[in-house]
Design a protein with these regions (language model features):
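Cytoplasmic helix-loop-helix junction between adjacent transmembrane helices
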Residues: 106-142
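Helix-loop-helix hairpin linking two adjacent transmembrane segments in secondary transporters
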Residues: 139-188
Length: 401
């Protein structure tokens, strides 16, 4: 296979893998949460938040695992391991009638999500020259956006004919995941296996070599705490607090997915032109504004806000990853990004449980979204503390992964 064709095929498979790991294995929970909560969890937002925390807590554990695996496996090898876990979790969620098994499924999908997500941006970024790294890392979010759109629209379609559809949606996603995992094992291969260098515990030894690593880690942590609140509770907020129908709430969630598809490309490309620091700061402020906009309950304002959420949902990580890629070569990328993702994972692990408890305490999700906006502004301050200029050390596009 020609090099150009192999790169296209590689991109297609890793983007589909990101869709399975993130959109299906993690963010579909936000779509099915009201149905699953009422079906298995006795309508408890606290329990639903705990289940969300189990998923992101497992994601946190996965970042530690992948930091260890990165020095022993190629990036492609990590993608395959993550796919096995994510697909297994989808299978459990598709057929269980027990809350404990659903919790286990979310844990497994959280592990798979981390193990896949860490290598995917690195593989995508190395397909492009250094001056296009922001655009390249934005591509990694395309698969996630497509998956979110699919989950939102499919949920709306299923609800038009059935009362309880959350497991039907998971079963459909399982079928897609089986196709993706088969494609990965057949077509996705490393030309020369070259594991990442060791980076200390959790990759933090390698991370400390990255310029502005403290500000970068703080920004990514703020993003992790804030985004999971908005993604997890937008549908519940609109249905429970604003009185929206499930179909209209699913439409709002779908607009997030459509915007995610383009958001990473747009924001990543902007960061190539005006710099990561300024772009990231503006993105965090925009996220805060959008979080507050969802609280209005007004259809036009909410739809504009969800579009903005979608753009920044993929745009903020694109700029963060581009900064990492600019300061790490292909062998140190795994440990470095694992370490930043570990901090991000800690923040998002505690966030859903806090949000669910606040919603039960206050009887609404209003304070939850104000909290998301406040933390986003903290992220903006951290982003503004980054050094102004990136230093490219990645070199030419490699031919191995």
């Amino acid at each position: 296979m020609a090099a150009a064709e192999r790169r296209i095929l590689t991109l297609a498979i890793v983007l589909a893998s990101a869709m399975v790991a993130q959109a299906f294995g993690r963010f579909t929970w936000g779509v099915v949460l009201p149905d699953a909560r009422d079906d298995l969890l006795d309508g408890s937002n606290t329990a639903a938040g705990l289940f969300g925390s189990l998923n992101v807590g497992a994601y946190l554990l996965g970042t530690i695992v992948v930091a260890w695996l990165a020095s022993r496996s190629s990036l492609v090898g990590l993608v395959k391991v993550g796919l096995v876990l994510s697909t297994s979790g989808l299978a459990l969620a598709s057929f269980t009638t027990r809350p404990a098994v659903l919790a286990l499924a979310l844990v497994i999908m959280g592990l798979g999500g981390a193990i896949i997500w860490v290598p995917v941006p690195g593989i995508a970024a190395r397909q492009f020259p250094p001056e296009r790294r922001g655009f390249a890392t934005g591509i990694a979010g395309v698969g996630i956006g497509v998956g979110i759109v699919f989950a939102g629209r499919m949920a709306a379609f299923l609800r038009s004919g059935e009362q309880d559809v959350w497991q039907t949606l998971y079963r459909i996603e399982l079928c897609i995941a089986l196709i993706v995992i088969a494609s990965a094992f057949v077509f996705l291969r490393s030309q020369r296996e070259r594991p990442s260098v060791a980076g200390g515990f959790g990759g933090f030894g390698a991370l400390r070599q990255v310029q502005g690593w403290k500000a970068l880690t703080g920004a990514y942590s703020a993003y992790g705490f804030s985004y999971i609140l908005v993604i997890s509770y937008t549908v519940a907020r609109l249905e429970d607090d604003a009185g929206w129908t499930s179909g209209r709430a699913a439409l709002a969630f779908t607009t997030i997915g459509f915007a995610v598809i383009a958001g990473g490309l747009i924001v990543g490309s902007i960061s190539d032109r005006i710099g990561r620091r300024l772009t990231m700061t503006i993105a965090f402020v925009s996220w805060a504004v959008a979080s507050i906009g969802i609280l209005t309950g007004s259809l036009p304002v909410v739809l504009v806000s969800t579009v903005l959420v979608g753009i920044m949902f993929s745009g903020i990580p694109a700029t963060i990853i581009a900064h990492v890629v600019a300061h790490a070569d292909e062998r140190s990328f795994g440990p470095v990004f694992s370490a930043t993702t570990l901090a991000f994972g800690i923040a998002q692990a505690v966030s859903p449980q806090i949000g669910g408890a606040i919603a039960d305490w206050r009887g609404s999700f209003t304070l939850v979204f104000w909290l998301a906006a406040a933390v986003a502004l903290i992220g903006a301050m951290a982003a503004w503390s980054l050094p102004e200029d990136d230093i490219e050390v990645g070199g030419d596009v490699p031919t191995d992964f």
